[in-house]
């Protein structure tokens, strides 16, 4: 499995972020020649010491000339574009920067691919939030795109720009977009995100603020999500344009639970790991919502299951256990178990 990445030149935009750091490390275990493009270093990437193993170009993705320069120099076989301003709340406080990074940044990558005639394969990572909220139980790739909030709309723009560039200029380039659920796992310290906020609070023996406790999300384990990206890339290598287009990568319906439920399960497992009483400090205060969010969000990954043979290996219980265990090892033993979890995942 995933043998096609051996000795391939892989360029990851956003390689130092949460998903990017896991993907970078996984690809190094597959003996790929990995290169990165990011505007700064993030904690998990530093903890993994990846900067000493992977050449990363530290530039702003909004700089078209630098994007062109790097693609020309690397001459990648495949690009994974994970760069983003990914925080919904920040899209409200600074919408212009959100659109500059997400939309113009993607436009620059596409333009560089067009003018540099590289690479052969490109995967652009968007989000499950691109779908128009129609009250469906689960959205398929063919459903109408929407984007009520600013972040979601920026990702819809990306889907449309990628599709337009493909039709207008890049007929000979293999391109796909990936729409994944709420991805969780160890090593995420993003601001205003549920798991990082919870872990920071637990480590300080404080309560945290929880908004919209009854809203349902498709919670996906980090390695399940990334395995989908990697399998899609491999199929594009092997079978070409029949694997282009949009792809959902989400969990089983049983793993789509409310934020309240995932918090309670996390508290239960964290209590067991730390041998503490739940009422010692674990808990949260409800935060009044200040911006729009979809109440129920689920995506249908039938296409990936049937055509790629992909399916999540972890249910929501396993996902929470693996995530809490990563943070427990970090906060209690100062140990980084990312590589161990990748190896264990591959054995399942």
Please report, for each region that a protein language model flagged, where it lies by residue.
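Short aromatic-enriched loop/helix-cap "lid" or pocket-rim segments at secondary-structure transitions
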Residues: 45-48, 134-137, 188-192, 222-223, ...
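The catalytic Tyr-centered alpha-helix of NAD(P)H-dependent dehydrogenases
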Residues: 146-154, 191-195, 218-222
